[in-house]
Each structure stands twice: as C-alpha cells, then as structure tokens.
Amino acid sequence: MDKDQFLMELYEEAYETEISDEQMGKLKEIANEDDSFNRAMVAKILVNSESEEGEEILLKLTHDKDSLVRAEACDSLCIGETMETYERLKKLSEKDRVGLVRGYATISLCDISEGLNMQSDTIKFLESRLDVEKVVFVRINLYTALYKMGKREYLKQLVQLLDVPRYQNRGAVANSLGEILDESNEEEIFKILLEH
C-alpha cells in the first residue's frame, strides 16, 4: 500500500479504532518526509491518538516550515496532556507569524488547560492577547476560548464578528457559536443574534 492510500484509509479508520504501534511508526516516518500534504495528514490523523508518541509527533510538527502543517498540528494538540504541549501552544498562539496557526493554537490551549489545571493562567494570557491581536480569525478563537472557559462577557464580541467582510471569518464565527451552543445559553445566543 502506498503512503497516500495508507494515510487516507487511516484517516477514515482512526475515528473508530485505535492507532496501532505499526501504524504509529509509519506516521512517524511520514512526518519526517518532504511532502507537506502528507505531514499535514499525519497531524490530522493524530487528533485520534491517545499515546505519548502521537503527542510527541504533533509537537515536532508544530516546528514545521509549512504553516498548514503547523496549523493542523496545533489543532490536533487539543488532545495534549503535558506542560510541554501547553507551553508550546502558548508560545505559538502569541508568536507564530501566521494567524491560522495562532488561532488553532489558541483553541487547543484552551482545550488542554483544564486537564492541566491551568485555566486561571490561560484566561489571563488570552485576555492579554486581545490587547494586541489584530487578525480576525485569531480574535474569533480568543473570544471562543475565553467564553468556553467561563468568561461569558465575550459572547457579544464574538457575535459582532459576524459583520466582518471575509466569509471565511463569518463561517468561523458560526462554527464557534455552534461549538459553544447548549441548553444553558441557546436563548441568550439566539437573542443576541436576533438583535444583531
């Protein structure tokens, strides 16, 4: 089986079955090869990994020269369980030169902060980022992350970003609202949307 077929099949299977040691070894090999599309696929697949090795591969991919690979790795690191991952995501959410990477690093940082008992630190850090971050996609993810961490006052700012010109950003706002929508806030979200 060639690499492309292996990656596509594993991408479909990984949601339902655990990644085997043999498959993990092959993913590690591909993560070190030249094809950036394949490296990005490795990162996408590893969101389904529950192993330290999967997290280590993703951490390595956050250093990739290709920003799409870094973005996919950051997105998949929502599974992270270590302070090393927390610190790497924190750094990327602030310092990566590409907004897409900063945005995905922000959401994954939020996702792993609870398991590491770092919510208070994360909230302070993310709120400080609001003062300097200009990229709309990153701001969407900052508002979403802060809302998910209990800072409900950021919902209105998130909804206001539905007015931005780029449809990709409006789609990201809609996705974020769908992600945070539940029985406890659906009335409030619908009210804000109707007022908006």
What is each stretch, according to the model?
Residues 17-32, 51-63, 82-95, 115-131, ...:
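Amphipathic alpha-helical scaffolding segments comprising HEAT/armadillo-like alpha-solenoid repeats
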Residues 34-35, 65-66, 97-98, 134-135, ...:
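Short inter-helical turns and helix N-cap capping residues of alpha-solenoid HEAT/ARM repeat scaffolds
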Residues 68-71, 92:
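Residue-level recognition of hydrophobic positions within alpha-helical transmembrane segments
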